[in-house]
Amino acid sequence: MEDVEIQHLTHGPAIAFRDDMTIHGDADHTDMRCAELDEMTSQLLCTTSISRCLKAARSISSRIRCSRRVVALALGLTHSVQTALPQLRSIPIAGTKPFPESITSTSDGALFIGRVGDGGIVRIKPRTAERTVFVKPGEFGSRSIMGVFADEAANTLWACSNNMRALGGPATGHDTSSALKGFDLKTGVGKRSISLPGPHAFCNDITMDSKGSVYVTDSANPTVLVLSPRATGFEEFASSRQFSPPRAGGAGLDGIAFGSDGNLYVTTYVVGELFRLDIERGSAARVTKLHGPPLAFPDALRPFGRNSFLLVEGSGTLDRVDIEGDEFKIASIRSGFREPTSVARVDSTAWVSEGQLSFFFDRAHKRGSPALPFRIYAVPLSKGQTR
């Protein structure tokens, strides 16, 4: 058990930016508005530029109201605000550049974590801190691993594989396309590989319905795809302009999960929105944008009881999202993480992965180096947070 460590989280935003922020300044630059700041967030993780922009914004004349997600990114991901949180148990992830992304769990409490930086999937048993390279980098043609999802009924670990070598991802693996990979959940042996349609697809996250169909978000296109149990390829399940990636670049669709109402819910990463896909007779009948507090780079979305989800925001928080009709409410469970990317629930614990992906995308190394070792954190869920 010596590898299980207790850590103080001493990074990330010190407050939850649930309300709009106000920036004051002098009288020389009245033409700069928060829309310009917001536009700068439409590139995937451009925190350095946003920091410069926020400094410039402090010289603007009148009071300028900026959405929380702009300020949270600049302050949270650049670690310019420090806070000390209560101690959390953590487990380190070996390596200098694993950049852990998605995390999923099985009924025995085992965790499976996809690695963007060096590829492969690691399995961790939190009770003993036993860590195993479950899928080796490059195995079964795989490249950078994004979303992972454990399908125990079919003995399959599904994983999103993307060729990110140009960004510093693994050189191992022969696939050049974005693909959904299926590995044996007991042995890690590759079973299935299904390419996403189109030349510029990006498999991000995964969920399943009760009939065994697999759904994935395509972050490069405004499309949710579905793979039926007996199908050999994907079909389009839903498409909407509202899912479109920003014109300036960056991720569109990201998190995906079924709610207790039987409908499908998705997030958009850069724009920061939450949608419900109303399902009728197995098809997406309507796409509804839900209204609520601003979201700062919403990533993984996981079911969490009746009409609720767990959600991680890239600005540093683990939230509970409660759906009420066409609106949602946010309750922050824990803040202060370094660019969290995913969450998996095991009984009364939420395991949060810190991806620190801004360092992965910073090819010029202007931001320095990520905090090592990479970690996953155990966040206790109180009775009041579950329902």
Task: Please describe what each predicted stretch is.
Residues 94-108, 116, 139-156, 160-163, ...:
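Beta-rich, blade/repeat-based domains predominating
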Residues 96, 112-117, 151, 157-175, ...:
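Conserved beta-strand positions in repeat-built beta-propeller and related beta-rich domains
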Residues 125-129, 184-189, 228-232, 278-283, ...:
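Short loop/turn segments that connect beta-strands within beta-propeller blades
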Residues 5, 10-16, 22-23, 27-35, ...:
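Short linear motifs in low-complexity or flexible loops
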Residues 87-93, 130-138, 189-196, 235-247, ...:
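A short beta-strand motif characteristic of beta-propeller blades
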Residues 175-185, 368-383:
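Beta-propeller blade signature
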Residues 171-211:
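Asp-box/WD-like beta-propeller blade repeats and closely related beta-sheet repeat scaffolds
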Residues 119-122, 166-167, 180, 222-225, ...:
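Structural signal for beta-propeller blades
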